[in-house]
Amino acid sequence: MYLDDAALDGGERMSMRVRRPGVRDGYDAWSTTYDETPNPLVALDRRYTMRLLEPRPSERILDAGCGTGAYLRLILLAGSSPFGLDFSRGMLRVARRRLPSVPLAQANLDDPLPVRGWVFDAVLCALVGEHLENVSLLFREFSASLVAGGRLIFSVFHPEMAAAGIEANFEREGVEYRLGARRYSVDDYVDAVDRSGFRGLRVHEFCGDAALADEIPWAAKYLSRPLLLTVEARKT
Ligand SMILES: C[S@@+](CC[C@H](N)C(=O)[O-])C[C@H]1O[C@@H](n2cnc3c(N)ncnc32)[C@H](O)[C@@H]1O
């Protein structure tokens, strides 16, 4: 879920305890219920990001920050060969159970990627960026792992939301767990891609809309507010 305090009514806010477990421990804890948690950002991302990725048969596609494997599954269904990385053992456990044939590895995207010897036709990195310390390293590593002309599809929680103090969170047994969101700007992401050996950048900003509010009624407060940023590019 991505919420701000305004999502909770006064009574709930008063009684809810808040914990900040850190990003990795937070996703480990969230992993068992992540796929069932109504989440406007994820819903919007699901609407656009696969369309941008357009996986083709036989392509090798890296899903960096693959979580529970929602995109790994769709990539596999398209006849491509996915490879998933994530640093949360809990999220990887769910992905492995769901997709036993897909290669997965535990990796911190703030470090050099453990994919030397692999080369990919496309890299997807969906809804991870605001958790990362070093996005410049990330895009350089993506560039190094792509074939010439290979595609990058990057989607992220819109910086305006993070700037408004909204962050990834979930609730369990009267406790709200907050996972944090770094305050990057749109330009921080776009410039880092641009400096990392990519060309043909296309940037899109997607706002909450009526269809999203139909799907998740409390997301009506995001009507016309930018929720999702995507950057597409090709390796030079
Ligand atoms: C919001 S989930 C998105 C998962 C998936 N991409 C999706 O669209 O469902 C964010 C994921 O990023 C992972 N993550 C966050 N920081 C990370 C890091 N530094 N290195 C690797 N994975 C990270 C989390 O473990 C989690 O699985």
Model-identified regions with their sequence ranges:
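Conserved class I S-adenosyl-L-methionine
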Residues: 2-56, 70-74, 91-94, 151-180, 207, ...
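Class I SAM-dependent methyltransferase SAM/SAH-binding core
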Residues: 62-64, 68-111
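A short acidic, Gly/Pro-enriched loop at the edge of an enzyme's catalytic core
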Residues: 114-123
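A short SAM/SAH-binding and catalytic strip from SAM-dependent methyltransferases
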Residues: 122-135
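A short glycine-rich, Lys/Arg-flanked "PGG" loop and its adjoining helix->strand segment in the class I
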Residues: 136-148
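Short alpha-helix
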Residues: 181-204
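Conserved Class I S-adenosyl-L-methionine
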Residues: 200-236
